[in-house]
Amino acid sequence: MDIRYEVGPKDFKTYTTEEMREAFLVESLFEEGALHLSYSHYDRLIIGGAVPSHEAIALDAGDALKTDYFLERRELAVINIGGKGTVTVGKDTYKMAKRDCLYVGRGNEHVEFASNDPQQPARFYLVSATAHQTYPTKLAPIGEAQPTKLGSDAESNNRTIYKYIHKDGIESCQLMVGMTLLEPNNMWNTMPAHLHDRRMEAYLYFDMEEDTRVFHFMGQPQETRHLVIKNEQAVISPPWSIHSGVGTSNYTFIWAMAGENYTFTDMDTVAMEELK
């Protein structure tokens, strides 16, 4: 398991591009036949990728968590961004197509990922946070998710937001997870920017062509930097940082939050004149 330690805003001001990438960019989540996990010390969030091929892949706690099994003290969100597959939780198996989301509650010992077709494998994106309460496992197919339209072509941010795990959707202990799809010829996300000092956030960018990139902006509003991101790479965003991006083409991203409070609207908007 890859470990990412916390960085404060004062130290961040001195970081080189390479130091920023080492601290905040997760480049290699998805590998056929493998499970990759990255542990952030910001709110103890774990993000990961599982790409089962001919054999199923079990969710393994490894040595880093010091628990008997992965979800002993954790909850989990699984979003499929690839071909059709299944997730088995205990004795129950859930079918998952692209963009479907599965919430798995604390205390489930056995979680296993499989693909229907090894030639078109499922690509499961995983997000896990610590949990002090158990909520039931629940599937949210993309067709049943409630879409919210925001932005406009004039602002280059015409997009659809799907909220999966939140106060008025699938209940969780502290995870909030959703997905944003940008329409063609629209490139901006989360601008005007905002902060939520009570929660960290992670972005996974995907549905991108090989030669396209997203320029992800981060840092305190008065001291911003950027990361250049490829398809299926993730960014860890500290609570003190903005998290916004612009692409060379449209894209999709999954956002996931953990920390204090459980209200989607708990955020502090940053005025344009504050950004530097």
Swiss-Prot record:
Zn(2+) binds at residues 194, 196, 201, 243. Its cofactor is Zn(2+). Its EC number is 5.3.1.17. InterPro entries: KduI, KduI/IolB_isomerase, KduI_N, RmlC-like_jellyroll, RmlC_Cupin_sf. One of its GO terms (molecular function) is zinc ion binding. Belongs to the KduI family. PANTHER family: 4-DEOXY-L-THREO-5-HEXOSULOSE-URONATE KETOL-ISOMERASE. This is 4-deoxy-L-threo-5-hexosulose-uronate ketol-isomerase. The gene is kduI.
